[in-house]
Amino acid sequence: MSFLRHRDHGRTQRRADRLTPVPSDQVSGVMSLCALDPVSAVSLVQQMQRWSRWGRGDVVALGGLARPVAAAWSVGSLMPFGLAGRPEHGLRAADAGEIWALAEHARTRLSRRGSVSGPAQDVAEVWGGLSEQGQRARHERWRQPVLAAPQVGGGLGRAHLRRRPALSWVGQSVRAARPDEAALVLPASVDMFSGELGYDPTTDGPGYNRHVTWLIEQRRSYIVLDDGAGHLAQPGSPRAVAFKADVGALWRSPTGGVAQLTGVWTRPDLRGQGIGAAALAAVVDAVRRDHVGADGIVSLYVNDYNTPALALYRSLGFEQVGLFATVLL
């Protein structure tokens, strides 16, 4: 696809006429936009809800504050939503000038190890302008299916363990990590992050450690502990994280609760034994119980080349409800 059109449309119009900074006390228009597709927009909403204040231009709207057609978080990474339009909801696509203006705005705000992520069609729209302006990618992941967990009477975990009763100890051990267990959780989180993104996040300073601690404090980091050898940890015995999953994004939207799982990880020596599936099924139930309600949506996204993970999710009944893309910088 050619993005030369960005150069030809509206270059004489000031960028400020295309983008509207969203103050932290005037988010209702953006939230209404996101409510049209809460599963796809939950990452953007998470950022706006986590921070009570932000700098001018950290959140921007396209099309005005009251009824924007698109919006984006632009601090270190870029999270766009709505650029490609949502005709089923009567929303037009952002025009070429608006998309170029967003790319120009975000370009100087992207960090060395940031990303552009969100619905694949929205990422594709803005990435063309960014690349034209000289932004280079470390890795492009254009097919990341968004999957949603099924609603199962009696709970997904219980239904799964009826098929795998030998793993009952796993499902029964799933719980939110405690603050005094942060030192146990952090190495597992770092291993997951390093394997997924290719570098140790702790080398960039204390930010990642703070994020892991924050998730634990919010009761959004779920773990299974074992004795280090794939057996239930007994009182007084050594303990290790066998499995973990985080609620990376969370929103109680007008149409119901939505959670997005991130950081799903099974310790390498335990993979292929069914432990990950048993634990994840129990996590889905726990997230509904603790955060989004019985009818809430629990979703995640996965690289399409991660065949083992896709097989695991589908074995539990997860179904595709969207498509994300991530461009790593």
Feature names for model-found ranges:
Residues S117-V123, P268, V298-L310, V327-L329:
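Conserved beta-strand-loop-alpha-helix junction that forms the acyl-donor binding cleft
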Residues M1-L44, R158-T202:
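Short amphipathic alpha-helix that is part of the acyltransferase structural core
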Residues W73-M79, G198, P206-T262, R267:
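Acetyl-CoA-dependent GNAT
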Residues Q121-E140, A277, D304-G322:
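Conserved active-site alpha-helix within GNAT-family acetyltransferase domains
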Residues R92-H105, T262-P268, G272-R289, L310-S315:
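Conserved acetyl-CoA-binding loop-helix of GNAT-fold acetyltransferases
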Residues S2-D8, R67-P68, V75-V170, V327:
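Acyl-donor-binding surface of acyltransferase catalytic domains
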Residues L110-A120, G257, V287-V302, F324:
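Conserved GNAT acetyl-CoA-binding A-motif
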Residues T12-R15, P21-V22, S32-P38, Q46-S115, ...:
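Conserved donor-binding loop and adjoining core beta-sheet/short helix segment
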